[in-house]
Amino acid sequence: MTIDKQMTAISKAEQERLLQEAEKVSERAYAPFSKFFVGCAILTSDRKTYVGCNVENSSYGLTNCAERTAIFTAIADKDDGRKLDIKAVAVVNRDGVPCAPCGACRQVIFEFGPNAIVIYKAADGSIAQTPITELLPVGFRLD
C-alpha cells in the first residue's frame, strides 16, 4: 500500500461538523473511573460519518477508546466488501481538555486510514489537524 504524504483535504465546515458530532457523543461515554469522557467522529472515503465514545471497565485493560469504538462500528456497518478507508478522525474531550488519540488508537487509525487527518481542539481553542503519519511516523503494516 502506498501512503500519500499529502493530508486529506477537509473543509473547515466539515472539521467543525465532525468536532460537533464527537462532542455530542462524548456525553454518552462511560468513564466512571477516569472521568475522562471522550467522543470521536470519523469520516470515511464514501462520505459516511460514524461516532463512538470511550467505554471503561472495572478491568482496565478491557476499556475501549472512543476512536476504536467509532472505527469498529464503521467496520461492522460496511456491507460492500471493501476495506474501510478513513479520511478524518475528530476527537473531543467532554470537558474541553485537548486530546489526541492514544498509541493504540493511532495504530488502528493508520490501519484503516494511512492518509487520514486527526482533528482536535488545541489548548488555545483553535482547531488542530495533524496527519496520522505525524502522530505515528512508523506505523506497523503487514501488507
What are these regions (language model features)?
Residues 2-31, 83-143:
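C-terminal binding/interaction regions
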Residues 35-44:
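Short beta-strand scaffold segments in enzyme catalytic cores
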Residues 37, 50, 59, 101:
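Short glycine/serine/threonine-biased micro-segments
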Residues 50-53, 128:
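Structural signal for short hydrophobic segments within the conserved structured cores
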Residues 54-69:
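Compact, glycine-rich, soluble single-domain proteins
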Residues 76-83:
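Phosphate/pyrophosphate-binding loops at sites that engage ATP/ADP/AMP, CoA/4′-phosphopantetheine
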